[in-house]
Amino acid sequence: MTYSELKTLAGFKAKKESGKFAYHLRKLLRQSLIAQNRAERKYMLTALGRLVLNSAKQIEEQALLESGRLFVRSSKHKMEEFTTDRIIHSLVTEAGMPVELAQRVASEAESRIYKFQTAYLTAPLIRELVNSILIEEGLEEYRHKLSRLGMPVYDVTEEFDKVGEGGFGIEALVNETANSVLSEYLLLVQLPHDIVDSHLSGDIHLSDVGNWSLRPDIVFATVDNETKVMKQIEGKFLFVPRWNILNKPLMKLAAINYLLSREVRKELYYHGFSNVVPVDVDEKDVVEIFNILTYTSVQNNNLPRITLEVDAKSNNLLNILNGYKEYVKATPFPMLGLAIIDASKIQEDLFDILTEISKNNGVISLNKDSKTMKSFYGFSAELTGKVGPMILGSVSLNMPRIALDAQSDEVYFRARTRLQMQNAVNALKIRKKLIENNIKKGLLPFISTFDDVVLKDYSLLRVNMTGLSEALALVNSTDSAEKIVTETVESINEYFKTVAEDGHSDFALTLTSDDSASRFIQLDRDKFGRSKIKNIALERYSQGILLNHDDIANKSKISYTKKLVELINGGVDVKLVLDTKDERKENKDIFKALSLFDYFSLISLLKICSRCGRKQQGNVSRCQFCNGGLISNYS
């Protein structure tokens, strides 16, 4: 370090002390404890200096032990002398313990600490000791409140190695370590034990536990020429320029996307996108729009999907589709997708473009309704005035588990489903309050500020059913699957009417995809045995509805799918798989699906190379271009 830095750190701050400091500095130089780098005008420790410093530290620590005084390395990044007052203060303020009891526990902790004869005493070690005393004394309720959240050193070290392989960099490492703490906080503090036990046992599943209590899953945001972003910004987002972008709708959209994508967990749906794209826009400009939206989205492993609503009647539809086609060709895993509303108006000569987009891993959904919005994951929502709502879901029921517990009894299956639904509903009620508090506290500043973009006072609460088809196969009944589903869902819908106690939320079922499918099957293998589960499913339970070329011609499959869509009010994720390798057949499948369903999305089963990013079809195990590992776009 420099002369002035060294002087300040040594405590010689006044000018009149400069001579005294220079005297001591010369002494250290003569004894070869420090050396001077004349070129950089800096001083550094020599090898002898380090040896002397380490020896001095050891002597100091031993002297502390001999004197009976102990110093604690606290979580405030300071060395503090050990005193029982800090333990008493923590027990009283954090755990709510009576003072006399806290003094007794602190005294016991002190006697044990002095028996340790350790020179390296830390705050976490003292807390662990106090918690062990509380357990021994049967004071479990206080121990629970005194728990310390965090990760073991080994796990943090492993995270450094693992996160780098994902390609998201240092932000992903920070997110993963933060998620670990927030997950523990949710399960230990914010949720009651019965809901936590249901999640841990596999009866229900809470997705992305680290973010579950922080952010909404899906936000339906309105963006049009009347959205007044900068007029409401006031003292928030001080790092954002205060330009007047009222007449620059695409710049306005980029600003909204930059701020809002940080506050949404799963998907951000922009209603009215095609209305703000100029009619005379060309394909190159459309590609630039998609690039800007990609670059202004939060870039880490929590990146939400961006869905842009496009009206099939728009004069710029062709250019938007062609621009999106070029965008997905250049992007291995596009996080931007198009939701085409009023899709029955699409001209058939555009089906070729839709197919090509899907073959390049693009995300296209077709919605014949122009008033009901449908997200990429199949969630339904309607505008309230001009503003869209938030969706809070991420709670899934393990339907095969319910069927296995019912042991082929149809009546018990329905009753058990309704019983598990109570836990799911209670979890969502708590989540709604937690996120509302986050909005009030300013933790979600965009959502709390911009009332003409997001409806913050009204939430759609959604419970997902995972493995419904496997569950129906397990229920031994003379009734058809359609009848069992009808009676079960109608019973749940009636129950939902009784629990929507206020006018600011509503409950509904969904059939969508999340991370519960693989977790449920693993937990069920542990509970019921691998051989029993093997006959039900292999790697994951079914989610949503997948339709291929053969299914489109299957009347019973179509009838069953239509019934599910009719019954399940929250939305059904219907996906049409383009897998025939015959473009004419696939175009006919799209046309037929449009005549059968009000909503579906298009997918093609692809594999993307993790090394070169190229896309390839077919049953291949390694990249055909560079022999790299492959990632499936849909699993």
List the predicted regions and their residue ranges.
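DNA-binding alpha-helical recognition surfaces that contact promoter or target DNA
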Residues: 8, 23, 128
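Conserved catalytic cores of very large enzyme subunits
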Residues: 163-457, 478, 482, 486-633
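Conserved phosphate/anionic-ligand binding catalytic regions in large, soluble enzymes, centered on
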Residues: 455-472, 631-635
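A short, conserved structural fragment
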Residues: 29-39, 501-507
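Short, cationic-aromatic polyanion-contact patches
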Residues: 39-60
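Short amphipathic alpha-helical interaction segments
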Residues: 14-30
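Charged, amphipathic alpha-helical regulatory modules used
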Residues: 61-168, 455
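Short acidic, hydrophobic short linear motifs in intrinsically disordered regions
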Residues: 2-12
